[in-house]
C-alpha cells in the first residue's frame, strides 16, 4: 500500500523536476531570454544608407519650393474671364461685377454683420437639429426672425 501511494508522489516530483529543467536550463524552452535580449541590443549598428543627392542639395531644392497663393479673381485665368463674360451677358455691368466680387471677398472679414452666416447658423430656431447654443434660444418663437 505504501508503494502505491508513493508512486504518484514520485511521478509528480519527477514531472516537476523535468519542468524546472526545461524552463531554467541554459536554453530553456525558448532560450535564455536575458541572453537573447542582450544579443539583440549589441547587434550590428546599421550603416548609413547611401543616397543619390547630398543633404544640403536636397534641402536647398526643397527650400526653394513655395506654393503660389491662389487668387480666385485673377483676371488672367481663362475661367475667370469666362465668368466675367457670363456675368456681363446676364445683364450686369462692370461696376456691378466689381461690387459683387468685393462683397464675396470681404464677406467674412467683418464679424458684426447680423445677417451673415454666424447668426444664421447659431440662432436658427426652426432647424431640425435644434439650436446650437441653449443660451441663444428664444423660447416660444415659432418663426425664424433672421429671415426677415
UniProtKB/Swiss-Prot annotation:
One of its GO terms (cellular component) is extracellular space. Residues 32-70, 133-148 form a propeptide. InterPro entries: Augurin (IPR028173). It is found in: Secreted; Cytoplasm; Apical cell membrane. GO terms for biological process: anaphase-promoting complex-dependent catabolic process; cellular senescence; G1 to G0 transition. Expressed in the intermediate lobe of pituitary, glomerular layer of adrenal cortex, choroid plexus and atrioventricular node of the heart. Expressed in the brain with high expression in the choroid plexus and the epithelial lining of the central canal and expression in the gray matter of the spinal cord (at protein level). Its main location: secreted. Residues 1-31 form the signal peptide. Pfam families: Augurin. Keywords: Cell membrane, Cleavage on pair of basic residues, Cytoplasm, Membrane, Secreted, Signal. Belongs to the augurin family. Probable hormone that may attenuate cell proliferation and induce senescence of oligodendrocyte and neural precursor cells in the central nervous system. ECRG4-induced senescence is characterized by G1 arrest, RB1 dephosphorylation and accelerated CCND1 and CCND3 proteasomal degradation. This is Augurin. It comes from Mus musculus (Mouse). The lineage of its organism: Eukaryota, Metazoa, Chordata, Craniata, Vertebrata.
